Every structure is written in C-alpha cells, then in structure tokens.
C-alpha cells in the first residue's frame, strides 16, 4: 500500500529542512529529488502556503508522485490583495479591500474543495474568510455584502461568471 505524507510548504521554496526532511527521510526517498519536484510543481504559488501530498508508490524502487492542492482561501486573498497578512484588529482596521470580481475569482479556484453547492455560496464562504482576516468587500463590512448577495444585488455578476466557466 502506498504511503502518503501531507505537508504545507511555501510555493516554489520547499527545502530539505522541516517539515519536509523529517517527514520523507524515513521513507527512503531522495530528499533533494522530492524537494526539487515539489518546487517545480508549486512555483506558480510563490509566496503562498500550499498543501502538498507526497505519495510513495513503491518504496523499494523509491518511486513517488506529488499532488499539489489549492492554497487556503486566506492565502489566495492575501495574494490577490498583495498584503503580507490579515488585520491584527479585524473589524476595526481593514487590511485591504476585495472587489466582488476578486471574490468570484477566488471562489472559482476553491469551489471544488468547498461544500458550497454553487458559485454564490462559494463566494459567501470566501467573504466569510475575508471577514475573519479584517478585509472589506466592495468597501463594506463583509456581512453586509453577504446580505446583498442573498438579496440578489450581485446576481448579474454571478450569471456572467457562471457563463464564463
């Protein structure tokens, strides 16, 4: 049976040190080879924490494959806004402001990993993460924007986004 190691690494900057080295060293794999593969597979997520699965297919032959997940929603929001972190005073001092277009872009990236039944619900999940990070949406409190979504204020925007999929 294949062994699986799951780690969170910075895109394009995995190193043989912790958490990778200690996790894959005991499996008998060439750590440098694994690190190089991970860096190649995650380079487009540079600066973001990315979930990675290392699947050891045959320990005797030392064969493995890498599966790269989608970064957490908070990482995608930070990347979209170009901010290093969320607000340390969420609710008082905004860390940034997302447009609905940016919310929908992030929701489209994450929808396959969410429990949301549609793009509207996925967008509301993204907005919930923005709220916890102290990020406003359309210059407003994220809770207000969630109510507006329920009221149909952004229906035209969602219809366009779903057509483009």
UniProtKB/Swiss-Prot annotation:
SUPFAM superfamilies: Ribosomal L11/L12e N-terminal domain, Ribosomal protein L11, C-terminal domain
Record-linked PROSITE patterns: RIBOSOMAL_L11
Keyword list, A-Z: Ribonucleoprotein, Ribosomal protein, RNA-binding, rRNA-binding
GO process terms (BP): translation
Gene Ontology molecular functions: large ribosomal subunit rRNA binding; structural constituent of ribosome
Recorded superkingdom: Archaea
One GO term describing the cellular component: large ribosomal subunit
PANTHER family: 60S RIBOSOMAL PROTEIN L12, LARGE RIBOSOMAL SUBUNIT PROTEIN UL11M
Family: Belongs to the universal ribosomal protein uL11 family.
Function: Forms part of the ribosomal stalk which helps the ribosome interact with GTP-bound translation factors.
Subunit relationships: Part of the ribosomal stalk of the 50S ribosomal subunit. Interacts with L10 and the large rRNA to form the base of the stalk. L10 forms an elongated spine to which L12 dimers bind in a sequential fashion forming a multimeric L10(L12)X complex.
HAMAP family: Ribosomal_uL11
Protein's UniProt name: Large ribosomal subunit protein uL11
Species lineage: Archaea, Methanobacteriati, Methanobacteriota, Thermococci, Thermococcales
Gene that produces this protein: rpl11
């Amino acid at each position: 049976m294949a062994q699986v190691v799951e780690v969170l690494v910075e895109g394009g900057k995995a190193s043989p040190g912790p958490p990778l080295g200690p996790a894959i060293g005991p499996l008998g794999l060439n750590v440098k080879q694994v690190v190089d593969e991970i860096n190649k597979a995650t380079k487009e997520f540079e600066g973001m924490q990315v979930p990675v699965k290392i699947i050891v297919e045959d320990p005797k032959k030392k064969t493995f494959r890498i599966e790269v997940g989608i970064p957490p929603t908070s990482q995608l929001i930070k990347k979209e806004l170009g901010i290093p972190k969320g607000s340390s005073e969420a609710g008082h001092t905004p860390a940034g402001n997302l447009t609905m277009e940016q919310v929908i872009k992030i929701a489209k990236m994450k929808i396959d990993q969410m429990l949301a039944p549609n793009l509207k619900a996925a967008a509301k999940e993204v907005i919930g993460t923005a709220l916890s990070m102290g990020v406003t949406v359309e210059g407003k409190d994220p809770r207000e924007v969630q109510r507006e979504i329920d009221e149909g204020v952004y229906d035209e925007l969602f219809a366009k986004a779903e057509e483009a999929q």
